[in-house]
C-alpha cells in the first residue's frame, strides 16, 4: 500500500516541481531583454507595489511570456495526444506535417488576403491542419505501416506544404517580411491582441482534453481492447485527433511554425511521470511551456537588441533528438 502511494505521489511531485520551475522562469524571462530588469523589480511591479518599469513589463514582455506559455502548452499537449492515439513515439504536430499544413493555410491568408480580420487565422490554420490529419489517417489505416514510415510520410507532406509556402512568398512578395518572421516561429512583436486570439481557443480545448484523458489511456492500449470495453474506437480516434489538430492549428496561427515542442515535451514528461495520461498530459503541457519560454528568453538575451526566433532554437535542440528517436525506432523493428 505504501509503495503504491509513493508511486502515485511521484508524478504529482514532478508536476508540482515543473509548475514552480515555470513560474520562476517566467519572472526571470520578463526581466531579460535590451533593458535588464531584476527579478525583485519584476515581482514588485506585478504585485502593483512599484511602477518603475510598468509600461515595458505590462505592454511588451508580459503578453509575450503568457503567449509563450499558452502556445508551448498547446503544442506539447497536441503532441502527447497524437503519440497516444497513433501509438507512435515519433508523432507530433510538426513531424507528421500538421503544423506545416496549418502554416500553409495561415500564410495563404496573410499573403493572399492581407486585409482579412485577424480572427480568421486560427480557423484557416485549423482547416489546413485538418486536411493533413485526414491524409495521415488514411495512411495510418494500413496495419502494416511502421512508426518510422508514418513519420516519414508526415515529413513528405510537410515538405509539400513548405514548398507551397515558398511559392506564395515569391508570388506575393508584398508582406514577405512578416511571412518570413512567422514562418521561422517567433514571439517577436506579439502583444495582448495575440493573447486574446489564442486564449479563448485553449480555454475551450483544454477542458475537452481533461474530459478525454481516460479515453486516451484506452486508445493507447489498442482498438480491440477499446471496442471490447464498449467504446467506438474510430469515433474516439477522430475526436482526439480533432482536438489535437485544433490545439496545434490555433497555436501555429498565432506564434508561427515552432517545431519539435510536441515531440520533445511528451518524451521528457514520460520519463518523469510514466504513461498514464492524467499525469502525462499536464506534465507535457508544463514542459512545452518551459521549452518555448526558454527558447524565447535565449533568443532575446543572446544578442540584444537583435532577436533569434524561438523556432530556430527549438529546431537546434529538437532535430538531433528526432534523428535519435528515428534511429532508435529503426533498431526496435
Swiss-Prot record:
Transmembrane segments annotated in the record for this chain: 12-32, 65-85, 95-115, 120-140, 194-214, 238-258, 279-299, 306-326
Keyword Disulfide bond: no
One GO biological process term: siderophore-dependent iron import into cell
Keyword terms, alphabetized: Cell membrane, Ion transport, Iron, Iron transport, Membrane, Transmembrane, Transmembrane helix, Transport
KW Cell membrane (keyword) present: yes
Subcellular location: Cell membrane
GO function term, MF aspect, one: transmembrane transporter activity
InterPro entries: ABC_BtuC-like, ABC_transptr_permease_BtuC
Domain of life: Bacteria
Primary site of residence: membrane
Membrane topology: Multi-pass membrane protein
GO cellular component: plasma membrane
Family under the similarity heading: Belongs to the binding-protein-dependent transport system permease family. FecCD subfamily.
Subunit structure as annotated in this protein's UniProt entry: The complex is composed of one ATP-binding protein (YfmF), two transmembrane proteins (YfmD and YfmE) and a solute-binding protein (YfmC).
PANTHER family: FE(3+) DICITRATE TRANSPORT SYSTEM PERMEASE PROTEIN FECD-RELATED (PTHR30472:SF37), FERRIC ENTEROBACTIN TRANSPORT SYSTEM PERMEASE PROTEIN (PTHR30472)
Role of this protein: Part of the ABC transporter complex YfmCDEF involved in citrate-dependent Fe(3+) import. Involved in the translocation of the substrate across the membrane.
Protein name: Fe(3+)-citrate import system permease protein YfmE
Native species: Bacillus subtilis (strain 168)
